[in-house]
Amino acid sequence: MGSVLVDLQIATENIEGLPTEEQIVQWATGAVQPEGNEVEMTVRIVDEAESHELNLTYRGKDRPTNVLSFPFECPDEVELPLLGDLVICRQVVEREASEQEKPLMAHWAHMVVHGSLHLLGYDHIEDDEAEEMESLETQIMQGLGFDDPYLAEK
């Protein structure tokens, strides 16, 4: 199995309680499961203001969100190992973990896995797509040693 090279960007004032680069690489690799070659992605951890601005600009939603995924789009004839960018909002992840009574690192891992699957083309707009994506997220999270992230909803 190949590996995932992560360009980690910390753009939040409070770095206390953030996952390490090693953890993020482990979670992304578990989700992407690259075969052979190395693939690359950027993970940017931001505050609510940046998340809000990006969510409004790119999704038309006037609020911060937990994770935004920006897949790298490249012409078919060009082979680059770039998956794209994830933007994860520290405050939203912390708030959701608290509200859902989940361990904070488990929720961070889930956001990296969830966002990575979006970079691979998975989506959850339609019910059948959501079911497939959630099932895959559960398998990956359990493979990484975490509980089913959707257990409370079931």
Curated annotation (Swiss-Prot):
Stated role: Single strand-specific metallo-endoribonuclease involved in late-stage 70S ribosome quality control and in maturation of the 3' terminus of the 16S rRNA.
Cofactor info, note text: Binds 1 zinc ion.
Classification via InterPro entries: MetalPrtase_cat_dom_sf_prd (IPR023091), YbeY (IPR002036), YbeY_CS (IPR020549)
Listed GO MF terms: metalloendopeptidase activity; RNA endonuclease activity; zinc ion binding
Pfam family name, one: YbeY
UniProt record similarity statement: Belongs to the endoribonuclease YbeY family.
Protein's name according to its UniProt entry: Endoribonuclease YbeY
EC number, UniProt record: 3.1.-.-
GO cellular component: cytoplasm
Domain of life the protein comes from: Bacteria
Source organism (scientific name): Haemophilus influenzae (strain ATCC 51907 / DSM 11121 / KW20 / Rd)
Names of the cofactor(s): Zn(2+)
Gene3D superfamilies: Metalloproteases ('zincins'), catalytic domain (3.40.390.30)
PROSITE patterns: UPF0054
Record bears the keyword Chaperone: no
Record keywords: Cytoplasm, Endonuclease, Hydrolase, Metal-binding, Nuclease, Ribosome biogenesis, rRNA processing, Zinc
A GO BP entry: rRNA processing
Chief localization: cytoplasm
Protein's UniProt keywords contain Chloroplast: no
Subcellular location: Cytoplasm
Binding site for Zn(2+): 114, 118, 124
